[in-house]
From Swiss-Prot:
Keywords: Activator, DNA-binding, Repressor, Transcription, Transcription regulation, Virulence
Record Pfam families: Staph_reg_Sar_Rot
Keyword Amino-acid biosynthesis: no
GO BP, sorted A to Z: response to stress
Known role: Global regulator with both positive and negative effects that mediates modulation of several genes involved in virulence. Also, modulates the expression of genes not previously implicated in pathogenesis.
Protein name: HTH-type transcriptional regulator rot
Induction and repression of expression: Up-regulated during anaerobic growth.
NCBIfam families for the chain: Staph_reg_Sar
Superkingdom of the source species: Bacteria
GO molecular function: DNA binding; DNA-binding transcription factor activity
Amino acid sequence: MHKLAHTSFGIVGMFVNTCIVAKYVIINWEMFSMKKVNNDTVFGILQLETLLGDINSIFSEIESEYKMSREEILILLTLWQKGFMTLKEMDRFVEVKPYKRTRTYNNLVELEWIYKERPVDDERTVIIHFNEKLQQEKVELLNFISDAIASRATAMQNSLNAIIAV
């Protein structure tokens, strides 16, 4: 009986030791997992800046090639998608700083991308239209933008995946 009790105690002792070891492993695993989650979370959040940098570099490339600001590009894209509209309506789609507003639209007029129209019944309203004579230039600009995006697609997708994983 003594031997059986010793054996039982040995088994119980091993079980207790196993539980202690298991608890130690679980605690360390949780700390490791927490650290990994925190590192992955931090990495994912930092990818916001990386993605923003890629987007900014696309607009910089367009600006360099076409001598148009980000706002001017967005105005054109909005006109192509939505059609002609008043300046006030465009303000809902593209944010242009008040001190840059006149210069922004006048630059697009000077470059002949758009033209302005004032209705006879309301001289205060200005409607902007895309200049359909620049249809070929529109296609070229869209191709340029598409190529700029495609050249960064993998990097931007990786950043986006890391962000979404947060």
